[in-house]
């Protein structure tokens, strides 16, 4: 069985449990999402960047 490390967002400690044993907050997995070459949300991200002017410095 594969068990992944989890991190407490409040105190920053690592654990294997759903709740932090020190402060009792919920933990999350600090691993990044999987990379996909198809990028199903790419068009939405590009649209948002265009709307907020993220690429305004480029010509």
UniProtKB/Swiss-Prot annotation:
GO terms for biological process: pseudouridine synthesis; rRNA processing. The keyword rRNA processing applies. Pfam families: Nop10p. SUPFAM superfamilies: Nop10-like SnoRNP. It comes from the Archaea. One of its GO terms (molecular function) is snoRNA binding. Keywords: Ribonucleoprotein, Ribosome biogenesis, rRNA processing. The keyword Transport does not apply. GO terms for cellular component: ribonucleoprotein complex. Belongs to the NOP10 family. Involved in ribosome biogenesis; more specifically in 18S rRNA pseudouridylation and in cleavage of pre-rRNA. PANTHER family: H_ACA RIBONUCLEOPROTEIN COMPLEX SUBUNIT 3, RIBOSOME BIOGENESIS PROTEIN NOP10. This is Ribosome biogenesis protein Nop10. It comes from Archaeoglobus fulgidus (strain ATCC 49558 / DSM 4304 / JCM 9628 / NBRC 100126 / VC-16). The gene is nop10.
